Design a protein with these regions (language model features):
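Active-site catalytic microenvironments in core metabolic enzymes, especially phosphate/sugar-handling
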Residues: 1-253
Length: 253
């Protein structure tokens, strides 16, 4: 299957009309979209280490969640870290496609996976663009018990918690940066909101708002989507070599 054919097939499953207006995703770069894809690498972020690994391991295609190019490039020179990666990729005939907010929204994508991992039942979309998911746990938990459970399930280095001193049962999730969805989660009836990033100012008001808040890390709340991409590629071409690579560059010391 060629790069172009593969992208078109993936767009049938992750439609372009799900993309947020401010977002930039799609086929990010390709020297030849008619090139056959035999070896693919899946990652959350296209870091320079990921690019170098792809070059040294004869990868034809990188599929990422976060866009390789987010802000417009005014020039393509090796003075820019983004342009430098694009140059390397083009020189080595490696294509990149990214899916970002449409993979957040799509059925079976980032937020459905996150809800499933956390044991949230009957999860339904909520919030602007219906990006988030909200549902209920099978049993009520204390905030402390749920926080430790979540930390283990997501394999987090640690989580930030702001406790409204209420039990946890109706839980809303938004992978990545979800601070703008706290109000929508509260309006939808959530007693607890989980996201990758919420921020100090919002978390400081959790008690006053009457909602438990857990900040579990951008990477840890979105990394599971790599398995979603892997499954899609394997179904489209069972003979394709597909590898997932961890791109987390942030450490908790």
């Amino acid at each position: 299957m060629t790069v172009k054919e593969l992208y078109e097939k993936l767009c049938e499953r992750i439609p372009e009309d799900l993309r947020e207006e401010w977002d930039n995703d799609g086929l990010m770069c390709s020297s030849d979209d008619g090139r056959e894809v035999k070896r693919a690498l899946i990652t959350l972020d296209v870091t320079e280490d990921i690019v170098d690994y792809a070059i040294s391991h004869d990868i034809d295609l990188i599929v990422s969640h976060h866009p390789l190019i987010f802000k417009p490039l005014k020039s393509v020179t090796d003075d820019s870290h983004v342009a430098r990666k694009v140059i390397k990729l083009i020189k080595n005939d490696i294509s990149v496609m990214s899916f970002h907010t449409r993979a957040d929204k799509v059925e079976g994508g980032v937020n459905d996976i996150l809800a499933d991992i956390l044991g949230i039942k009957n999860a339904v979309p909520f919030g602007e663009g219906f990006l988030g998911r909200i549902g209920t746990l099978e049993e009520e938990l204390t905030m402390e018990d749920f926080s430790y459970l979540l930390k283990g399930l997501l394999d987090c280095d640690g989580v930030k918690v702001s406790d409204a001193l209420i039990p946890v049962q109706k839980v809303a999730v938004v992978g990545g940066d979800g601070k703008s969805y706290v109000g929508a989660a509260l309006k939808a009836g959530a007693d607890t909101f989980v996201s990758g990033r919420i921020g100090y100012n919002v978390m400081a008001e959790a008690g006053e708002m009457g909602i438990n808040l857990i900040e579990a890390g951008h990477f840890f709340t979105e990394q599971p989507v790599t398995q979603f991409f892997q499954g899609l590629l394997h179904r489209l071409d069972p003979d394709m070599y597909v590898e997932i690579m961890d791109s987390n560059v942030i450490r908790l010391i």
